[in-house]
Each structure stands twice: as C-alpha cells, then as structure tokens.
Amino acid sequence: MKASLALFSLLTVFTSYSLKSPAVPPTVAQIQANSNFAIADGARQQIGSTLFYDPAYVQLTYPGGDVPQERGVCSDVVIRALRSQKVDLQKLVHEDMAKNFAAYPQKWQLKRPDSNIDHRRVPNLETWFTRHDKTRPTSKNPSDYQAGDIVSWRLDNGLAHIGVVSDGFARDGTPLVIHNIGAGAQEEDVLFSWRMVGHYRYFAK
C-alpha cells in the first residue's frame, strides 16, 4: 500500500512538472533551421500563384521590386522565397555589384549595375552566394540537402537554372525542388536531373 502511494505521488509530481514547466527556448541553430524551412515554405507559396515563365526585362521599384506574382523566371522563385524571410536579394546583389562590379560575370555587356535585372540572373546569384559564404558542397547524396537550400545547375543546353529544395521527397527519398522552368512554380523531382554547379544555404546551421 505504501509503495502504491509513493508511486502515485511520484507520478503526480512528474505530471505536474511536465505540464507547468516552461518550454525550453529554441537554440540559435534551431531558429536558423526553422528559417531555412521557412524559405522552402516561401517557395511553396508560389505554387499555384506563379503560373507562367516570362523572362521579359521589367522596370522594377528599388528596393523590394518584383515582377507580377503570376509570372517570372527561375530566379524569381528564389528571390520571393528569401523575401518571405525579409532577405531582399535585389538590394543585396545591387549593393555588392556597385562596390565590386568586376567580381561579377561580364556576360551582358553592361558598364554598371542594373537593379532591374542583375539579381534575376542566375550567374549573379551564384556569385553573390559564393562571395557571402553561403556555399555548401555539391554531392549526389540526397541527405546532404535540406529544405530551404538553394541549388543551381547547367541544363543540357548550357543555360543556367536555379531552384529551392522543398520539404517534400520523392519515393526514393530524394528531396524535391520548387522551381520555374517553363510552366510557373512547380514542385518536382529534379535535384539530380542536370549538372549541379551550386549548392547554397542562406542560414548556416
């Protein structure tokens, strides 16, 4: 009988502590991981709202400029996903190019930065991510990629492409990618479909 009462008292104390004790605050690493996950969610929010691929040059407001939500190119998926975390690549890329123009690819016969288009060009994004220590190793191991990572490729025709790793998985465990390669923002099993040239993680774990 005494043993039963002692056990009951112990369970009561444990239950009381479990219900009333404050939650352990998240660590900085956990907060950063959640932010990376939110980048993936920011990309996911574009599925069904970004419906067209449209590479037209557009005059944008600065900072915070964007083309109409229903259209865009592959880089716009990344730009909008990061904006969901209050990261403005238009501003960041423009400011870095203004100070270090020669460090960026000279592919477009420009003499100075152009805040309307520079951040929408994949090679410029690759350069910015690399210059700001966002790079991760490229590999064929699916477990090396987490939701919110940004990956760039060279397509079979040589064109640059970029997308956001989602929190979804293919049947074989490969992370899916949210990207726009012609039909608006889509979530597809394309992580290892082309030659990967860049792997980036904005919020380091």
Model-derived segments and spans:
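Second-shell loop/turn segments in exported
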Residues: 25-32, 60-69, 111-115, 136-140, ...
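Bacterial Sec-dependent signal peptides at the C-terminal "C-region" and cleavage site
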Residues: 10-30
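Sec-exported extracytoplasmic/periplasmic mature domains
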Residues: 44, 48, 79-87, 94, ...
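Acidic helix-start/capping segments at beta-turn-to-alpha-helix junctions
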Residues: 54-75, 88-112
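Low-complexity, Gly/Ser/Thr/Pro-rich intrinsically disordered linker/tail segments
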Residues: 172-205
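Sec-dependent signal peptide recognition
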Residues: 2-8
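...with weaker cross-activation on analogous glycine-rich loops/strands in unrelated enzymes
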Residues: 37-40, 98-178
